[in-house]
Amino acid sequence: MSVEDTQPLITHLIELRKRLLNCIIAVIVIFLCLVYFANDIYHLVSAPLIKQLPQGSTMIATDVASPFFTPIKLTFMVSLILSAPVILYQVWAFIAPALYKHERRLVVPLLVSSSLLFYIGMAFAYFVVFPLAFGFLANTAPEGVQVSTDIASYLSFVMALFMAFGVSFEVPVAIVLLCWMGITSPEDLRKKRPYVLVGAFVVGMLLTPPDVFSQTLLAIPMYCLFEIGVFFSRFYVGKGRNREEENDAEAESEKTEE
């Protein structure tokens, strides 16, 4: 392979390294800004459970190092979540030069909407699901059982719920992409509504902890988001995409001829 052939690859690798470093720096900077408030952040996240615990019950730490490492771990996860827009922008900046004009027009709204939907999903979990789920679980504890949740186990539980609801709220973005690529159409999706409803409960069962309450609270919003995605996908059907591709291809060929 000649030097001329390897030059583009080296350029791309250098650009990729730059974008990865920017992502790492963003996470580290946010983490350093938040680490001082690590205990406050954990208290904020644990508040929905503490409010539902019986009087006199508290959270416990079954590991010697848990009181120190668990809030730090949570703070790092929060830093990753808050830096998501920066990470997505770096991904966009890396792939943008290789995209057609019509693809660039679609990517920016998708990046913005996917970030917003992810945060909305997490907020829905915190403000709606957590109080209902923890209240239900605490009230159904057998008589004589002292409810004292381990702080590390609680973190794993709530992060699983946060991720499940954040990812599930991306359903409209996924549907728009599928219709834009021509893989499916709004008409086909409307015909499959019964299967989607069943699938939403199956996904809720797989993504959430093993209690029917959390599964239902995830499945119902997922189906509603499916309907929202079907509504907006009619503006991004494959025919329009094909026309845009043809126009961009013609523009590229004209530039090449010149």
From Swiss-Prot:
Record carries keyword Cell inner membrane: yes
GO process annotations (BP): intracellular protein transmembrane transport; protein transport by the Tat complex; response to radiation
TM region positions: 24-44, 76-96, 116-136, 157-177, 193-210, 212-232
Cystine connections: none
Cytoplasmic side: 2-23, 97-115, 178-192, 233-258
Side of membrane Periplasmic, spans: 45-75, 137-156, 211
PANTHER family tied to this protein: SEC-INDEPENDENT PROTEIN TRANSLOCASE PROTEIN TATC, SEC-INDEPENDENT PROTEIN TRANSLOCASE PROTEIN TATC, CHLOROPLASTIC-RELATED
A GO CC annotation given for this chain: plasma membrane
Effect upon mutating E103A: Export of TorA restored
KW Hydrolase (keyword) present: no
Changes seen on gene knockout: Disruption blocks the export of at least five twin-arginine-containing precursor proteins that are predicted to bind redox cofactors, and hence fold prior to translocation. Disruption does not affect the Sec pathway.
Family as reported in the entry's similarity comment: Belongs to the TatC family.
Free-text function comment from the UniProt entry: Part of the twin-arginine translocation (Tat) system that transports large folded proteins containing a characteristic twin-arginine motif in their signal peptide across membranes. Together with TatB, TatC is part of a receptor directly interacting with Tat signal peptides.
UniProt topology in membrane: Multi-pass membrane protein
Keyword field: Cell inner membrane, Cell membrane, Membrane, Protein transport, Translocation, Transmembrane, Transmembrane helix, Transport
Name of the protein in question: Sec-independent protein translocase protein TatC
Known partners and oligomeric status: The Tat system comprises two distinct complexes: a TatABC complex, containing multiple copies of TatA, TatB and TatC subunits, and a separate TatA complex, containing only TatA subunits. Substrates initially bind to the TatABC complex, which probably triggers association of the separate TatA complex to form the active translocon. TatC can form a distinct, stable, multimeric complex independent of TatA and TatB. Each of TatA, TatB and TatC are able to interact in pairs without the third partner. Interacts with the signal sequence of DmsA and DmsD.
Subcellular location as annotated: Cell inner membrane
GO MF annotations in UniProt: identical protein binding; protein transmembrane transporter activity; proton motive force dependent protein transmembrane transporter activity
Predominant location: membrane
